[in-house]
From Swiss-Prot:
GO terms for molecular function: cAMP binding; guanyl-nucleotide exchange factor activity; protein domain specific binding; transmembrane transporter binding. Keywords: Angiogenesis, cAMP, cAMP-binding, Cytoplasm, Guanine-nucleotide releasing factor, Membrane, Nucleotide-binding, Phosphoprotein. This is Rap guanine nucleotide exchange factor 3. The modification Phosphoserine is found at residues 79, 531, 867. Disulfide bonds: none annotated. One of its GO terms (cellular component) is perinuclear region of cytoplasm. Its main location: cytoplasm. Residues 384-521 form the N-terminal Ras-GEF domain. Interacts with PDE3B and PIK3R6; form a signaling complex that regulates phosphatidylinositol 3-kinase gamma in angiogenesis. Residues 218-242, 398-422 are annotated as: Interaction with PDE3B. Expressed at low levels in adult brain. Strongly expressed in parts of the neonatal brain, including the septum and the thalamus. The lineage of its organism: Eukaryota, Metazoa, Chordata, Craniata, Vertebrata. It comes from the Eukaryota.
Length: 926
């Protein structure tokens, strides 16, 4: 007899087959869990390669109902009806992977003809295959952007998952070993060495490299906890860091979870995961897909999506399930924690927790950790240390001062503790409270001589004061650009300097230690540069000399700075006031009244280009720098609010700049944009991210103007792309402009300006641009492929994993995608309480500081390479007659000059009204 499925080869099955009653009547719709040896079905399954991305179904032919005549497989679908866009996209991705596998197979055969051959292992002959190690070696030798064995293993795992590669024994996990053999299915491909095929191979390897980490993570999760390697546990832990459901847990708990998580897939929508009233046995985290939460009497209560969790309450309270969970879509994946593991982790955490009390109240909560212990590595005896989990501000500061050591390295846990505290103290310990506490510690002396010796008592006091000075030096280094205009801070520093000058022993130690420390342990400031701190005098000199300016602070907006407030009237006349950047709306109205431009009863509102009006609260601060793109402030009588119209300048340009852009190459334009963006990015103080997420209502006398200016630039760039394309009326030049913007995005990515790269790509994906089908059709095939390759970095799945992996591979200087960093900060802030049992949740502060330090890493090289155009500015002679000998007009020459291009990229004029962009788009292509 023959067993087959449509479109594949037929295999002959011998007549000596014994039917077993155990599999004589399997149900249509799925394969049995256990198939006994010697049965027909068992033999078929052994011979058949079944990709994991497919489901399988038994099909009985009615001519012989007592025998299994055939077996067919059908792809998983995500809906009961017709395939939707998501299914089509998944199928297209599978097709791309199969095509990539064939291209790789062809190239490997052409480069290494003996790679695929018959192999004999343990007296068994395996036809036309290669070992896992040889396949990885071959992929690495090809280059093509693959630089490590783990990356090559990920590529092979993707091919294995999609059926483009198969194991000779149908194992699902790719292994980089000599004794594991794999083959490419299908006939041997014909050789082809054209240039187009090579480009397709590069594109194919980029696709496989992008999907490789996800495949390796899936394999790690599918393994039982006891089989996971250290590297796989680290990989799972990094995934948990970005999952919303566990954001409130400490890193030690996340590492414990990484060791016990179980992978649980379900293929069919409508499957009931558990029912209301069932006994709670597991906690679930949605890794892929969504579920409906249904209760008796209320029906559908809510829908949970990727990153959400459910089932924890029943475990904590040891109660029955409070709702029924039903799969909302096909192919859902869950991360499961069983009850016994959950309870063990909770007990372990409690056992490692130490609480310090004063006067009957808990003032500090510490957690015991082991230095050098990873998620799977056992603790090292004798190397335990305690990490602050929560506490009062004063106790956290006291513990920090006790833990500081003068000889600690940059990677010492105490240094990280100090950095976390300094970056986040404004959230829980304002400067005035910090100053008072530090002065108190400076004056406090032990009640009894330490060890009974007056000398040791004096040494203890001196060491403690040294630690205070070291903390203050680090604090000044971090915040020095913001402190010069702060009278409270300068008064505190003066008091501390006076106290130091009265202590002879401390002054002598400072004179000996600080010059050497400046050479070997230079302190970081808020912009990622270094600055000298304390000088060898009787008292510390906290700020750098004027001869040593901080280059990155030039042009930054500080708290005491005055900025222009452009106030519009209903008749569109404009009044400009210069007020402090942190001025409140009430103070702005008072300044207007002082200038006799405000009458009683008038209010301040902001109006955008679409005519939407939003009132400004009297206590709102920094409204001038927080305005959105093309927004203006209006002073108006309340009865005239609904009659306001946008200022003409808010509406944007009516003519495009395509002629000027034609004269500048995409690479030079990217260089100009990157240099301008770097200047804006370098002026952002690290702590502005924390202030921005907390909001001005939580913190006074701070500004986030530099960060808001950078964010406004992101919006400006994406609308600039859409504006220029919508204002280009001729199809040919419009297609050329579209091509230039795609190349611009590629150059921005190459220059590691990821923020502007995302802005340009978002502009190209604007609905007003994506609908211009005739314009996109004019693009060459190569440019369309380039755009498709760039789009992969925008993939938002699994919390933008593709972008995050790409970012980790880049060396500084880098301009990161700022909106995602702010999203992470908001995620941390809103997902974790600032107070836990009336104590500061310092674990939350630690997570926020870790996210903020990304800015310092990206700016650890303080200068960005100048763009080619800017580097030539100094060589341009204004009176050069030779430059005028050209067929171009003087206007064209001035347009293409570096100075004019530099001015253009700084003052982009855009249309940000989506309705207007859509109208222009419909006029171009109805």
């Amino acid at each position: 007899m023959k067993v087959s499925w449509p479109g594949e080869n037929h295999w002959q099955v011998g007549p000596a087959v014994v039917e077993s009653p155990a599999v004589g009547a399997p149900q249509v719709g799925g394969l049995p869990d256990v198939v006994p040896e010697g049965t027909l079905l068992n033999m078929v399954l052994k011979r058949m390669h079944r990709p994991r991305c497919c489901s399988y179904q038994l099909v009985f032919e009615h001519r012989r109902p007592s025998c299994i005549q055939g077996l067919r497989w059908t792809p998983l679908t995500n809906s009961e009806g017709s395939l939707d866009f998501r299914v089509s996209l998944e199928q297209a991705t599978t097709e791309h992977v199969h095509k990539a596998g064939k291209l790789l197979y062809r190239h490997l055969l052409a480069t290494y003809p003996t790679l695929i051959r018959d192999r004999k292992y343990h007296l068994r002959l395996h036809r036309q295959c290669c070992s896992g190690r040889e396949l990885v070696d071959g992929i690495l030798a090809l280059g093509l952007g693959v630089h490590s064995r783990s990356q090559a293993v990920g590529i092979c795992q993707v091919l294995l998952d999609e059926g483009a590669l198969c194991h000779v024994k149908h194992d699902w996990t790719f292994q980089d070993r000599d004794a594991q053999f794999y083959r490419f299915p299908g006939p041997e491909p014909q050789p082809a060495g054209t240039h187009d095929v090579e480009e397709e191979l590069v594109e194919a390897m980029a696709l496989l490299s992008q999907r490789g980490p996800d495949a390796l993570l899936t394999v790690a999760l599918r393994k039982s906890p006891g089989q996971r390697t250290d590297e796989e546990l680290d990989l799972i832990f990094e995934e948990l860091v970005h999952i919303k459901a566990v954001a409130h847990l400490s890193n030690s708990v996340k590492r414990e979870l990484a060791a016990v998580l179980l992978f649980e897939p379900h293929s069919k929508a409508g499957t009931v995961l558990f029912s209301q009233g069932d006994k709670g046995t597991s906690w679930y985290i949605i890794w892929k897909g969504s579920v409906n939460v249904v209760t008796r009497g209320k029906g559908l209560v809510t829908t949970l999506h990727e990153g959400d969790d459910f089932g924890q309450l029943a475990l904590v309270n040891d109660a029955p399930r409070a709702a029924t969970i039903i799969l909302r879509e096909n192919n859902c994946h869950f991360l499961r924690v069983d009850k016994q593991d959950f309870n063990r982790i909770i007990k372990d955490v409690e056992a490692k927790t130490m609480r310090l009390e004063e006067h009957g109240k808990v003032v500090l909560v510490l957690e015991r950790t082991s230095q050098g212990a990873g998620p799977s590595r056992p603790p090292t005896p004798g190397r335990n240390r305690y990490t602050v989990m929560s506490g009062t501000p004063e106790k956290i500061l006291e513990l920090l001062l006790e833990a500081m050591r003068p000889d600690s390295s940059a990677h010492d846990p105490t240094e990280t503790f100090l950095s976390d505290f300094l970056l986040t103290h404004s959230v829980f310990m304002p400067c005035t409270q910090l100053f008072a506490a530090l002065l108190h510690h400076f004056h406090v002396e032990p009640s009894e001589p330490a060890g009974g010796s007056e000398q040791e008592r004096s040494t203890y006091i001196c060491n403690k004061r040294q630690q205070i000075l070291r903390l203050v030096s680090r604090w000044v280094a971090l915040y020095s650009p913001m402190l010069r205009s702060d009278p409270v801070a300068t008064s505190f520093l003066q008091k501390l300097s006076d106290l130091v000058s009265r202590d002879t022993r401390l002054s002598n130690l400072l004179r000996e230690q600080y010059p050497e420390r400046r050479r070997h342990h230079r302190l970081e400031n808020g912009c990622g540069n270094v600055s000298p701190q304390t000088k060898a005098r009787n008292a510390p000199v906290w700020f750098p000399n004027h001869e040593e300016p901080l280059p990155s602070s030039a042009g930054a907006i500080r708290v005491g700075d005055k900025v222009p407030y452009d106030i519009c009237r209903p008749d569109h006349s404009v009044l400009t006031l210069h007020l402090p950047v942190t001025a409140s709306v009430r103070e702005v109205m008072a300044a207007l009244a002082h200038e006799d431009h405000w009458t009683k009863g008038q209010v301040l509102v902001k109006v955008n280009s679409a005519g939407d009006v939003v009132g400004l609260q009297p206590d709102a601060r920094g409204v001038a720098t927080s305005l959105g793109l093309n927004e203006r402030i209006f002073v108006v009588d309340p009865q005239e609010v609904h009659e306001l119209t946008p200022h003409p300048e808010q509406l944007g340009p009516t003519l495009g700049s395509s002629e000027m852009l034609d004269l500048v190459s995409a690479k030079d334009l990217a260089g100009q944009l990157t240099e301008h963006d770097w200047n804006l990015f370098n002026r952002i103080h690290q702590v502005e991210l924390i202030h921005y997420v907390l909001g001005p209502q939580h913190l006074r006398d701070v500004t986030t103007a530099n960060l808001e200016r950078f964010m406004r630039r992101f919006n400006e760039l994406q609308y600039w792309v859409a504006t220029e394309l919508c204002l280009c009326p001729v199809p040919g030049p419009r297609a050329q402009l579209l091509r230039k913007f795609i190349k611009l995005a590629a150059h921005l990515k190459e220059q590691k300006n990821l923020n502007s790269f995302f802005a340009v790509m978002f502009g190209l994906s604007n609905s007003a641009i994506s609908r211009l089908a005739h314009t996109w059709e004019r693009l060459p095939h190569k440019v369309r492929k380039l755009y498709s390759a760039l789009e992969r970095l925008l993939d938002p799945s699994w919390n933008h994993r593709v972008y995050r992996l790409a970012l980790t591979k880049l060396s500084p200087p880098v301009i990161p995608f700022m909106p995602l960093l702010l999203k992470d900060m908001t995620f941390i802030h809103e997902g974790n309480h600032t107070l836990v049992e009336n104590l500061i949740n310092f674990e939350k502060m630690r997570m926020m500081a870790r996210a903020v330090r990304m800015l310092h890493h990206c700016r650890s090289h303080s200068t960005a390479p100048l763009s080619p155009l800017r580097s030539r500015v100094s060589h341009i002679h204004e009176d050069s007659q030779a430059s005028r000998i050209s067929t171009c007009s003087e206007q064209s020459l001035s347009t293409r000059s570096p100075a004019s291009t530099w001015a253009y990229v700084q003052q982009l004029k855009v249309i940000d009204n989506q309705r207007e962009l859509s109208r222009l788009s419909r006029e171009l292509e109805p």
